[in-house]
Every structure is written in C-alpha cells, then in structure tokens.
C-alpha cells in the first residue's frame, strides 16, 4: 500500500485529537475537485465517490452525521444504527463502545455535496452538514401518496403517484376542469368520521384531488369538500377553484386556492379550508325524508392570470 493510503487509513480510524490535520486531508485533496473561488468556498471540496462512500453507514446506507461511531478496528456506522445493532460492530463483531470517529467528521465538514434529489431536478450544491436540512424542504423531494382512505406509505414524483392512485387505490380519473358529483349515504346519522377521495382531475395539464369528508366540528357533525393540488405550494397558488351545493332555492358556495398535497388531507380538514356543510343542512338539501344523504356538489377549476 502507498504511504499516503496508509496515512489516510490511520487518520480515518483514529479518534485522537493529536492526529495531524494535513494527513487526514491528504486523500480528500487527491480525490476531490475544488470549487470555484468565492466567498466561503476556500478549503471546500466537491465530494468524490470514494470519500462519499466512506460517509455511508454500512447498515442503513444513509449518509452519517455526528456523532459518527467506530469500533476498535475502525469500522464506522451512524448513531441510529449503533442502537439497532446492540453495540456490536456489524463488520467484525467487536464491541463498539463509545469511540467517535472525529477524523471522518472533520473530512465531512470539508465537503460540498449535491442534493439527494439531483436526479429529480435540484442542481444545488451544499456544505455536507447543511445538506440534510435543505433536503427536508427541497421542492424536488418526493411527495407522499395523497390517498385519504388509508395511511399509505408510498412516495414518489407526481407521475408515479398518479399511476399509483389509479392502479392501486382504484381512484377515478377525470379529464376536465369542471365537476358535478353526487354523494349518497344510506345511513348518514351513523357516519361520524369518514373520508373519501372521489376522483383526480386532469386539468391544465396538472392533477387535482377532490376530497369529501364527514367529521365532528366541535359538537356538530359536518361534511366537507375540498381540493388538493398534486404539486408544490407555489404552483398551487396559480390556480383557484369553486364548490357549490344547494337545493330548494338555497345554496352554499366556496372559493379558494387548492392546497398542495405537501399538506396532509387531515391538516387541510382541521384548518377548515374548504366547503363545510352542517349535516342538518346537507340532509335538507337531500330532500325526501332526510334519512338518506343525496348531496350534489358542483364546481370548477381555473387558472389565475
């Protein structure tokens, strides 16, 4: 092995504060591409694949952040996985103890790395320890499945989720920017908490989810209809929608901006950001003997200029 490689191994495996910092950085400088000169960029390096792999936890394969732990033989892993493996090194089976890999933490501090959502469109580069915070709010990050009828764990981009809703949840897809839906329930007095996603609308080349829910608002049973946009909040603000329900020369109307599916259906419901219909009024609109819910909700979506 070359002398430089041996020095790097010793530096990465050591947790001693007396190790020469220039030795610890030797391999990084050899395998990393310097950034352009500028404020705050001196001494920072774009990560090469080799250094990047050193920072991947061998158990969960996620990038490691302080405290980075190591066993007496120098094998590293993240603090979360240290608990999962019951303090035993998964590589050599030695007891882990409480040894910090300070050298690797210092190496990470010198790196600038791309966002994990680079393949989805994010082209920004971040200092290693700022990357995680950015990714929690990156506008290119994956979306959660917007289906409201169950706690679905599927995530992905919008085309993936549209196919998932259609194929796995059997949600109706509708082309157009107007809707006219009739809700029928034979036992409305027994429905205290329920949620339905009736359809997904393809409108202006984008997708919108129409929700209808029954829940208690304080002591009053109510129904609520609202729209969510399959995209981020900034894009959602480019659209508006209206909802209307009524009968017997009376009607309720609602106009607003669709919420992004970044906000869960429960969050939208709890904020009361939609058309709210008291159950007694809904049954009045239903006609007949008020024992069956027959509620027609109409509306449209338009694009703000």
From Swiss-Prot:
Region SBD, residue ranges: 107-300
Main location: other
Catalytic activity: S-ubiquitinyl-[E2 ubiquitin-conjugating enzyme]-L-cysteine + [acceptor protein]-L-lysine = [E2 ubiquitin-conjugating enzyme]-L-cysteine + N(6)-ubiquitinyl-[acceptor protein]-L-lysine
InterPro entries: 7-in-absentia-prot_TRAF-dom (IPR018121), E3_ubiquitin-ligase_SINA (IPR052088), Sina-like_RING (IPR049548), TRAF-like (IPR008974), Znf_RING (IPR001841), Znf_RING/FYVE/PHD (IPR013083), Znf_SIAH (IPR013010)
Keywords of this entry: Cytoplasmic vesicle, Endosome, Metal-binding, Transferase, Ubl conjugation pathway, Zinc, Zinc-finger
Entry's localization field: Endosome, Multivesicular body; Cytoplasmic vesicle, Autophagosome
Record: residues binding Zn(2+) 2: 145, 152, 164, 169
Ligand binding (Zn(2+) 1): 115, 122, 134, 138
Keyword Lipid metabolism: no
Pathway membership, UniProt: Protein modification; protein ubiquitination
Listed GO biological process terms: protein ubiquitination; regulation of autophagosome assembly; ubiquitin-dependent protein catabolic process
The organism's place on the tree of life at top rank: Eukaryota
One GO cellular component term: autophagosome
ZnF bounds (SIAH-type): 110-170
Enzyme Commission identifier(s): 2.3.2.27
Gene Ontology molecular function: transferase activity; zinc ion binding
Zinc finger feature spans (RING-type): 57-93
Subunit annotation: Interacts with SINAT6. Interacts with ATG6 and TRAF1A. Interacts with WAV3. Interacts with FREE1. Interacts with ELC/VPS23A.
Record text about domains: The RING-type zinc finger domain is essential for ubiquitin ligase activity. The SBD domain (substrate-binding domain) mediates the homodimerization and the interaction with substrate proteins. It is related to the TRAF family.
Function: E3 ubiquitin-protein ligase that mediates ubiquitination and subsequent proteasomal degradation of target proteins. E3 ubiquitin ligases accept ubiquitin from an E2 ubiquitin-conjugating enzyme in the form of a thioester and then directly transfers the ubiquitin to targeted substrates. It probably triggers the ubiquitin-mediated degradation of different substrates. Mediates the proteasomal-dependent degradation of ATG6, a component of the autophagosome complex. Requires TRAF1A/MUSE14 and TRAF1B/MUSE13 to target ATG6 for ubiquitination and subsequent regulation of autophagosome assembly.
Recorded family membership: Belongs to the SINA (Seven in absentia) family.
Name the record gives this protein: Putative E3 ubiquitin-protein ligase SINAT1
Name of encoding gene: SINAT1
């Amino acid at each position: 092995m070359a002398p430089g490689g041996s020095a790097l191994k010793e530096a990465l495996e050591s947790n001693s504060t007396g190790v020469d910092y220039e030795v610890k950085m030797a391999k990084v400088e050899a395998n990393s591409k310097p950034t352009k000169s500028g404020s705050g960029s001196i001494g920072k390096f774009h990560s090469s694949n080799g250094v990047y792999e050193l920072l991947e936890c061998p158990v969960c394969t996620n990038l490691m952040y302080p405290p980075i732990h190591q066993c007496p033989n120098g094998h590293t892993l993240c603090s979360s996985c240290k608990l999962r493996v019951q303090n035993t090194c998964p590589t050599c089976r030695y007891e882990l103890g409480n040894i910090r890999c300070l050298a690797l933490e210092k190496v990470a501090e010198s790196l600038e790395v791309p966002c994990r959502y680079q393949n989805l469109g994010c082209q920004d580069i971040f200092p290693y320890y700022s990357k995680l915070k950015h990714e929690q709010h990156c506008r290119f990050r994956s979306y959660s499945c917007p289906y409201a009828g169950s706690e679905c764990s599927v995530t992905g981009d919008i085309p993936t989720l549209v196919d998932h809703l259609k194929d796995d949840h059997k949600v109706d897809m509708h082309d157009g920017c107007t809707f006219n839906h009739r809700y029928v329930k034979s036992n409305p007095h027994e429905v205290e908490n329920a949620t339905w996603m009736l359809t997904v609308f393809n409108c202006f080349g984008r997708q919108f989810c129409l929700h209808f829910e029954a829940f208690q608002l304080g002591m009053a049973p109510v129904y609520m209809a609202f729209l969510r946009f399959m995209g981020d909040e900034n894009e959602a603000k480019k659209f508006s929608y209206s909802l209307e329900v009524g009968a017997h020369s009376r009607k309720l109307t609602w106009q607003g901006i669709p919420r992004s599916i970044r906000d869960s259906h429960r969050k939208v419901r709890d904020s009361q950001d939609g058309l709210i219909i008291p159950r007694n009024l809904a049954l009045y609109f239903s006609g007949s003997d008020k024992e069956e819910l027959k509620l027609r909700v109409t509306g449209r979506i338009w694009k703000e200029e």
